[in-house]
Curated annotation (Swiss-Prot):
Record region (Interaction with substrate tRNA): 42-45, 166-170, 251-256, 284-291
Name recorded for this polypeptide: tRNA dimethylallyltransferase
GO biological process assignments: tRNA modification
Residues that hold substrate according to the record: T19, A20, S21, G22, K23, T24
Superkingdom classification of source: Bacteria
Broad enzyme group: transferase
Keywords associated with the record: ATP-binding, Magnesium, Nucleotide-binding, Transferase, tRNA processing
tRNA processing listed as a keyword: yes
Amino acid sequence: MSVSLQSRPTTIACLLGPTASGKTAAALALAARRPIEIVSVDSALVYRDMDIGTAKPTRDERARVPHHLIDIIDPADSYSAASFRADTLRLIGEIAARGNTPLLAGGTMLYYKALTQGLNDLPGADPALRAELDADAARDGWPALHARLARIDPATAARLAPNDAQRIQRALEVCMLSGQPMSALLAAPRAADDAAAAYRFVPVALEPSDRAVLHARIAQRFDAMLEAGFIDEVERLRRREDLHLGLPSMRCVGYRQAWEYLDGAIDYRTMRDKGIFATRQLCKRQITWLRAMPERIVVDCIARDSTAQALDALERVLDGLAAR
């Protein structure tokens, strides 16, 4: 084998798509054909005890094919894009060493971007500083901290809502630890990183030719979650003293709305409508991310044979037949 062939990157198929686009069906179809292991690209599936609202793969589905990065942390904890990148690169190597094929599947596009493009050199979390900022917010309110951020990093503040506690806290934390605005750090060239250079990530994107059809699916899916006991799931989480709406886990679509309903802040119908609307907004953002990937292979997720089309696209990628 020539040196050029030896150094050719290993192709990794990535099945990406918005909520309710059929990713699970396509991944399981591939698992019926090849010895794959699925690496979840989903920031909600990492949390334990959050099964219904995140549409986590069922026990039967997980028994049919190994899944990774699911149920790995407690809802009181956080999981970063940096952690995802490190874990995924490690898992890809471990899966290949077992003689299986890794398939990345999910819809958290920020994770995918971190994996394929690397990370900016931002300081890590500082628990003591976060506690200090939380205390300031408890006293003055998050809009006051948003105003503080606007004075030192107006570009970041301009894209954040005054009550976006998690992101305001992180932006202030970065500024205070680094001495630079987060917007400036994000705009700086990424540090050289060879960790992912051994791989060629090829995205197969499940996108709707008619968004209204996907919106109808989203409503049906949310109703199915409610019927499956989603409110009870959130109630169990709500009874925990260490969980609150400011945590990343409780920012997952649907959980905040169900929590507000249980608090008596909104009625059941409003909770349902807000949950569906939030899911549609997530879907819109996911599609925007996908369409910014010129290298993606597009499959119409509302076509009658969408699973077969996705399966064919994935197999072509893995067989080296997809255009480079």
